[in-house]
Amino acid sequence: CHSFFGTENDHDLVAKTGRARSINRHSWNDNDLKDLILNDKNPENYLFNELRRRIRIRRKQEAFHPNATQLTLHFGSSIFAFWRESINRKQCIFAINNISDKSQKISLLELNLIGTESWTDLLTDKKFTANDNSITLEPYQSLWISNESRSS
């Protein structure tokens, strides 16, 4: 539950049980949880809706099919990245995630984007070309750069 909503750690439960694992074992009352995610002033509301948006986008991408080809890309310890190709080989997605609390610059040349295709970040609709040299990812930012966009 905590991962879906970004809820706060339950330090009181840790103190009560004496177990560190209790930090994310809070039992939620349905109404309290609904109040958190339905109030657009709460960060839990934003996180829940953003997760839902990303799931909707992801479900429409052939390259995210469970049987699609996947390769891990190496951009250092602050970047978690992988490349996926749809079964029919029409769609490629470069999923690039900054897993650090600092901005990270990566070379788009290392992705080897095919110059004859248009490339779009599925999360922001930002366009990329094979001529773009690099991109800076903000802390914890993710990009899903695809050559074939399925509408969100």
Across the structure, where does each feature detected by a protein language model lie?
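Loop/helix patches that line or flank the sugar-binding groove of alpha-linked glycan CAZymes
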Residues: C1-Q104, L109-E110
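Intrinsic-disorder/low-complexity regions
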Residues: W28, N97, T120, N131-D132, ...
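A residue-level signal for conserved active-site and pocket-lining positions in enzyme catalytic cores
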Residues: R54, W119, Y140
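Beta-strand-rich binding/interaction modules
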Residues: S103-L123
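Short beta-strand and strand-turn-strand segments in soluble, beta-rich domains
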Residues: T124-T129
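C-terminal beta-strand-rich structural cap/linker in extracellular carbohydrate-active enzymes
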Residues: A130-S152
